[in-house]
C-alpha cells in the first residue's frame, strides 16, 4: 500500500474522481479542502489547488509534507501548441519549464534562475506505467514538453514564441511548479494533460466548451494508473 496524491487545479479536474470514489473524508487545511479515500489497496489524497503556480505549489507541498504522499499524479487540461495535438488528446510531460520566469535582463535564458535548471523532469517509471495503461486501454498517449506560466494563452504570437523557445507541445498554469516541488522533496511525479483548446485565437471559447470532457478523460486515466501502482 502506498499513499498517492492526485492533484488538479480546478474542481472540474477532481470532481470526476470524487464521483467515482464516492466514499471519502475531507480535511480543511491552509485555505483548501483535501479529500481522502481508499482505492485498490492504496490511500489517496486528492485536491484541486486552484489555478496558478503559487496555489499548486502550496497544495503539492501540503500533500507531501503534511499528508505523507509518496507519489503525486497531476491530472488536468492544457492548451495544445503542437499542431498534431487535437482537443481531447492526452499528453504526459517528460519535462516542464516556466515560460514566465524572466531574468533575461541579467543575461540568463528565459525560464532560468540560479540554482535551478530550466527544465524539470518527471518520473520515468510513472511515465512508463502510463504508457502501459494507454496500451491496455487502446488510448493514444503522447509524450512531450509542457510550458507552465501564470497566464491563459489565447494569442497566436505568444503561443509561437513559447513553443519556439522551449520546444513546448502544450501550455498550462501549474505543472512545472508541482514538478519542482516533487523534485525537491524526492517524490515521484507524473503530469498528465488532456487538451481543452489550442491556445490560440478564441482559445477561451474552446476551453469553456471542452474543459469538462477533457478533464474527465485525464482523471479516468490517472485512476487507472493507481490500479497498477
From Swiss-Prot:
InterPro entries in the cross-refs: MTA_SAH_Nsdase, Nucleoside_phosphorylase_d, Nucleoside_phosphorylase_sf
Family annotation (Pfam families): PNP_UDP_1 (PF01048)
Active site: 13 (proton acceptor), 197 (proton donor)
Membrane-crossing segments per the record: none
Root EC class: hydrolase
GO biological process: L-methionine salvage from methylthioadenosine; L-methionine salvage from S-adenosylmethionine; menaquinone biosynthetic process; nucleoside catabolic process
Pathway connected to this protein: Quinol/quinone metabolism; menaquinone biosynthesis; Amino-acid biosynthesis; L-methionine biosynthesis via salvage pathway; S-methyl-5-thio-alpha-D-ribose 1-phosphate from S-methyl-5'-thioadenosine (hydrolase route): step 1/2
Catalyzed reactions: 6-amino-6-deoxyfutalosine + H2O = dehypoxanthine futalosine + adenine; S-adenosyl-L-homocysteine + H2O = S-(5-deoxy-D-ribos-5-yl)-L-homocysteine + adenine; S-methyl-5'-thioadenosine + H2O = 5-(methylsulfanyl)-D-ribose + adenine; 5'-deoxyadenosine + H2O = 5-deoxy-D-ribose + adenine
Binding residue positions for substrate: 79, 153, 173-174
SUPFAM superfamilies: Purine and uridine phosphorylases
Record's keyword terms, sorted: Amino-acid biosynthesis, Hydrolase, Menaquinone biosynthesis, Methionine biosynthesis
GO molecular function: 6-amino-6-deoxyfutalosine hydrolase activity; adenosylhomocysteine nucleosidase activity; methylthioadenosine nucleosidase activity
Subunit structure: Homodimer.
Family statement: Belongs to the PNP/UDP phosphorylase family.
Task performed by this protein: Catalyzes the direct conversion of aminodeoxyfutalosine (AFL) into dehypoxanthine futalosine (DHFL) and adenine via the hydrolysis of the N-glycosidic bond; this reaction seems to represent an essential step in the menaquinone biosynthesis pathway in Campylobacter species. Also catalyzes the hydrolysis of 5'-methylthioadenosine (MTA) to adenine and 5'-methylthioribose. Can also probably use S-adenosylhomocysteine (SAH) as substrate, leading to adenine and S-ribosylhomocysteine.
Listed name of the protein: Aminodeoxyfutalosine nucleosidase
The organism's taxonomic lineage, starting at the top: Bacteria, Pseudomonadati, Campylobacterota, Epsilonproteobacteria, Campylobacterales
Name of encoding gene: pfs
Amino acid at each position: 500500500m502506498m499513499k498517492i496524491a492526485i492533484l488538479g487545479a480546478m474542481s472540474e479536474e477532481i470532481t470526476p474522481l470524487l464521483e467515482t470514489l464516492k466514499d471519502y473524508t475531507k480535511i480543511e487545511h491552509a485555505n483548501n479542502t483535501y479529500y481522502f479515500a481508499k482505492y485498490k489497496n492504496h490511500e489517496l489524497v486528492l485536491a484541486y489547488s486552484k489555478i496558478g503556480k503559487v496555489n499548486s505549489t502550496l497544495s503539492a507541498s501540503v500533500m507531501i509534507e503534511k499528508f505523507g504522499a509518496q507519489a503525486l499524479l497531476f491530472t488536468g487540461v492544457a492548451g495544445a501548441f503542437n499542431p498534431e495535438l487535437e482537443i481531447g488528446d492526452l499528453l504526459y510531460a517528460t519535462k516542464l519549464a516556466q515560460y514566465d520566469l524572466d531574468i533575461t535582463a541579467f543575461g540568463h535564458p528565459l525560464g532560468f534562475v540560479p540554482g535551478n535548471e530550466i527544465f524539470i523532469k518527471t518520473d520515468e517509471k510513472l511515465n512508463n506505467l502510463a504508457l502501459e495503461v494507454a496500451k491496455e486501454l487502446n488510448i493514444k498517449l503522447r509524450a512531450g514538453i509542457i510550458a507552465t506560466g501564470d497566464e491563459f494563452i489565447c494569442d497566436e504570437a505568444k503561443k509561437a514564441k513559447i513553443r519556439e523557445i522551449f520546444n513546448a507541445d502544450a501550455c498550462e498554469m501549474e505543472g512545472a511548479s508541482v514538478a519542482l516541488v516533487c523534485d525537491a522533496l524526492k517524490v515521484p511525479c507524473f503530469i498528465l494533460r488532456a487538451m481543452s483548446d489550442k491556445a490560440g485565437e478564441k482559445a477561451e471559447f474552446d476551453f469553456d466548451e471542452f474543459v469538462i470532457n477533457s478533464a474527465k478523460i485525464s482523471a479516468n486515466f490517472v485512476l487507472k494508473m493507481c490500479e497498477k501502482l
